[in-house]
């Protein structure tokens, strides 16, 4: 029917509870999935989930190589849940601010384990385009939503949904968008509700650095390393491949003036240099 004898990625769909995850382990279903992979009918195994706790288990399984996961600035504030309806509630808890730690952990574990993320729900069902329905009280554009998703650690691609040709054009505009048009950071940093103050989102507003540091990448490696009791060897080696290290920071604080989230970058560079030893 598909006029092919193999599929690149075979998907295990909609595993949203830890109980469901445990049920499929060592099951006839999983035996079938592994058999398909052994026969080269599927080349890679993927899984979809809306729950970061389940997705983390998949990323650490050793056999799931790709995760289809819901990512946008609004959903990233939400704590782990088995109930997908919580994502589409009309009102968010007023205490929610910044990226939920479990979701941030997922993105970093995926990057560390070389598990790619394909994004779904990048527009939050269109809510982020309407300031009255957005939890931030401001609207974002499709280009800004796409850029947010693609700048999360481990994200490889995003799937967008369309009803009209104009909506397709709005998404394709990302290919030719300027940095200013992609800029989601200024919008959510200054939003009247649920701002991301104090959190590095790797947006790149800190550039350029007078010491030529890739600040966003250094921050990403620091976040990856501090997830573990000891710095993983792979993270250490990737950090050491950077042309300029955190120890070269001259603490001029020029980057901090540009950071829309008020991150204390010079302080983070000092901590990073101590952590990695350079």
Predicted segments with their positions:
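Active-site groove signature of glycoside hydrolases
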Residues: 1-20
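Iron-sulfur (Fe-S) cluster-binding segments and ferredoxin-like electron-carrier domains
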Residues: 210-226, 257, 261-275
């Amino acid at each position: 029917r598909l006029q092919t004898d193999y599929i690149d990625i075979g998907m295990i769909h909609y595993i949203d509870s830890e109980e469901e995850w445990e049920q499929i382990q060592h099951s006839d279903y999983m035996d079938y999935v592994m058999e398909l992979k052994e026969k080269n009918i599927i080349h890679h195994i993927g899984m979809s989930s809306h729950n970061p706790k389940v997705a983390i288990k998949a990323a650490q399984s050793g056999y799931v190589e790709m995760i289809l996961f819901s990512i946008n600035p609004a959903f990233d504030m939400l704590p782990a849940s088995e109930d997908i309806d919580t994502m589409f509630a009309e009102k968010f808890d007023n205490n929610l601010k910044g990226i939920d730690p479990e979701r941030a952990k997922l993105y970093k574990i995926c990057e560390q384990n070389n598990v790619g993320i394909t994004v779904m729900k990048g527009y939050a069902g269109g809510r982020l385009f309407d300031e009255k329905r957005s939890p931030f009280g401001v609207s974002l554009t499709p280009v800004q939503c796409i850029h947010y998703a693609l700048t999360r650690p481990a994200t490889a691609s995003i799937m967008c949904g369309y009803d009209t040709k104009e909506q397709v054009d709005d998404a394709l505009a990302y290919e030719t968008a300027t940095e200013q048009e992609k800029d989601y950071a200024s919008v959510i940093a200054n939003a009247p509700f649920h701002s991301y103050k104090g959190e590095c989102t790797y947006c790149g507003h800190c550039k350029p650095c007078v010491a030529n540091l890739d600040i966003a990448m250094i921050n990403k490696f620091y976040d990856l390393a501090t997830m573990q009791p000891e710095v993983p060897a792979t993270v250490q080696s990737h950090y050491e491949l950077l042309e300029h290290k955190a120890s070269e920071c001259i603490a001029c604080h020029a980057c901090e003036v540009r950071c829309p989230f008020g991150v204390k970058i010079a302080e983070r560079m000092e901590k990073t240099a101590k952590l990695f030893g350079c």
